[in-house]
C-alpha cells in the first residue's frame, strides 16, 4: 500500500472537509498540505505515530500520510533527511550513539542537548522535548531467580553471570554499548547467550529456557509476567527518552504546528506507555484505537 491509513476509524477521525477556511489554507500552503509521519517497526512507535497522526489531523488543516514499519532508526533518519517523511519518533540514546555516532554518555540532559544541537546544525532536524518516559534497557529476571542468586542490581547480575543464561535481542548482542561493553568492561560472561526477537524473549524466560532478558522499561510483557527489574547501579545504559524528530523548516514555517506538537511534551510516563503497549500486544487493540483513547483522555482530541 501507499502507507495511508485504512480502516473504520480513519474517516471518523479526519477533520470535516467542510470546515470553514480549511481548503483555502491548504492551497496557500502548497505542497505542505500533507505531513508524512514515519515510524520504525514495533508497537510502541506505532502507537506514538498514531498519536502524532491524530493530534495533527484533529487540530490542524494538514492531512497526514503514514509511512510506518520502516526497518529501524537509520532508515527513518535517512527518510527524514531526504524528505521522504516529515517526522518520526526515536530515542535520545539511539540518536546519540547510532544516528549521530557520538561517544557514549549516560547524563540524560546532556544527551538531549547534544542530540538537539547536532540534529539542528548538521541535519536541519528539530528535536522535541522528551515525551516523558525513559525506555531504557532494564535487565530482568523472574522473582525466584532474583531470590535464588541474590540479584537486585546490574552488579549482582554481572557477578553471577557465569551461572545464568541470557536471552536478548540481536541488537543487544551486537551494539557496542550493550553486551560487548558489559563483557569487555566488566568481565560479564553468561553461561549462554541466545539472540531472540522481541516477544520471544518473554516466551523463553516464561518457559525457563533463559534466566535473564534485556527488557525495555515500557515493555507490555514485563509487567504482565511480573518480572523483577534489576537496578542499573552502574549507570551503564544510556538514557532512551522518546522524542519527535521533525523537519525544522516545516516547524519554522508553521508555529501553530510546533505549538500543537509541543502538547505531547512530558505527557507520557513509563507506566502509561507500558499500559498502552499492553493494550495492543496483550489485549489486541489497534494502535490507532489506543492512540485515540490517549488523546481523548488528555483533552487533545474529541470523542
Language-model-derived ranges and their functions:
Residues 2-24:
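C-terminal transmembrane helix and the adjacent membrane-cytosol boundary/short C-terminal tail
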Residues 23-37, 155-165, 296-303:
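Immediate post-signal peptide segment of exported/extracytoplasmic ligand-binding proteins
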Residues 30-44, 62-68, 162-168:
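Short, well-ordered beta-strand elements
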Residues 43-63, 176, 180, 184:
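Short, polar/charged alpha-helical segment
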Residues 58-68, 162-165, 183-196:
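A local structural motif
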Residues 65-78, 170, 191-203:
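Short helix-initiation/N-cap motifs at beta->coil->alpha
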Residues 99-128, 209, 221-235:
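Ligand-binding "clamshell"
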Residues 109-166, 248, 266-270:
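A conserved helix-loop-strand patch within extracytoplasmic ligand-binding domains
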Amino acid at each position: 500500500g501507499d502507507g495511508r491509513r485504512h480502516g473504520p476509524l480513519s474517516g471518523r477521525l479526519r477533520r470535516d472537509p467542510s470546515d470553514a477556511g480549511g481548503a483555502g489554507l491548504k492551497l496557500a500552503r502548497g505542497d505542505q498540505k500533507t505531513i508524512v509521519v514515519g515510524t520504525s517497526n514495533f508497537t510502541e512507535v506505532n502507537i506514538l505515530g498514531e498519536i502524532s497522526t491524530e493530534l495533527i489531523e484533529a487540530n490542524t488543516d494538514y492531512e497526514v500520510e503514514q509511512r510506518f514499519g520502516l526497518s529501524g532508526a537509520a532508515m527513518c533518519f535517512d527518510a527524514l533527511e531526504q524528505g521522504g517523511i516529515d517526522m518520526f519518533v526515536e530515542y535520545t540514546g539511539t540518536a546519540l550513539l547510532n544516528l549521530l555516532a557520538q561517544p557514549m554518555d549516560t547524563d540524560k540532559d546532556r544527551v538531549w542537548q547534544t542530540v538537539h544541537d547536532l540534529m539542528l546544525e548538521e541535519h536541519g532536524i528539530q528535536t522535541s522535548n522528551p515525551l516523558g518516559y525513559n525506555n531504557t534497557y532494564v535487565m530482568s529476571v523472574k522473582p525466584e531467580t532474583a531470590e535464588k542468586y541474590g540479584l537486585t542490581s546490574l552488579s549482582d547480575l554481572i557477578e553471577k553471570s557465569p551461572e545464568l543464561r541470557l536471552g536478548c535481542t540481536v541488537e543487544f548482542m551486537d551494539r557496542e554499548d550493550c553486551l560487548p561493553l558489559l563483557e569487555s568492561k566488566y568481565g560479564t560472561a553468561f553461561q549462554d547467550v541466545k539472540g531472540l526477537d522481541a516477544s520471544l524473549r518473554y516466551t523463553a524466560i516464561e518457559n525457563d529456557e533463559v534466566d535473564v532478558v534485556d527488557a525495555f522499561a515500557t515493555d507490555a510483557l514485563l509487567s504482565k509476567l511480573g518480572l523483577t527489574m534489576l537496578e542499573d547501579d552502574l549507570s551503564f545504559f544510556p538514557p532512551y527518552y522518546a522524542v519527535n524528530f521533525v523537519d525544522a523548516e516545516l516547524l519554522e514555517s508553521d508555529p501553530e504546528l510546533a505549538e500543537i506538537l509541543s502538547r505531547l511534551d512530558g505527557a507520557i510516563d513509563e507506566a502509561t506507555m507500558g499500559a498502552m503497549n499492553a493494550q495492543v500486544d496483550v489485549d489486541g487493540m489497534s494502535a490507532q484505537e489506543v492512540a485515540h483513547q490517549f488523546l481523548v483522555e488528555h483533552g487533545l482530541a474529541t470523542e
